[in-house]
């Protein structure tokens, strides 16, 4: 598995994976996804299967960060893994890279929302040190509940 930063030619495969992984109202629009990726205060990581000439996107993660008066905070916008590639450590590695990007940008904490029914994702976040901080009843297009999880980030690893 190759992990690398997003490149402009990745968008079609990235959005095809978005459509495969999420249905409305959870799925992001193309315009919103482009906006997230273009944000200079964000990082998008790609997990790519490299079988000779055939490269396929196995997953991706998008993290953003914002400077606030009490310090920079980060937010995991999404982590998505192709169904055929799940349970193989890809999401954990994408999460690690997203955290490293946020840490390098000065973030001292990282937050995310997760569908209350996404047991696999909840298990991953808990195993990586995230703690539930709340629940929003009408988060996903005001139709579905989500848990709020957060984790403190230490200083960048030297």
Mark where each language-model region is.
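Extreme N-terminal starter segment of soluble prokaryotic enzymes
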Residues: 1-3
């Amino acid at each position: 598995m190759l992990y690398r930063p997003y490149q402009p030619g990745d968008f079609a495969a990235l959005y095809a994976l978005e459509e495969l992984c999420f249905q409305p109202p959870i799925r992001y629009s193309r315009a919103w996804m482009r906006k997230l990726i273009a944000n200079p205060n964000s990082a998008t990581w790609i997990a790519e299967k490299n079988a000779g000439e055939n490269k396929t996107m196995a997953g991706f993660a998008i993290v953003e960060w914002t400077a606030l008066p009490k310090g920079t905070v980060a937010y995991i916008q999404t982590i998505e893994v192709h169904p055929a590639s799940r349970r193989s450590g890809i999401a954990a590695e994408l999460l690690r890279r997203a955290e490293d990007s946020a840490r390098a940008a000065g973030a001292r904490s990282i937050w995310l929302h997760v569908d209350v029914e996404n047991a696999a994702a909840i298990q991953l976040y808990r195993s990586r040190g995230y703690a539930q901080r709340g629940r929003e009843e009408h988060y996903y297009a005001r139709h579905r509940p989500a848990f709020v999880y957060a984790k403190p980030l230490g200083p960048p690893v030297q």
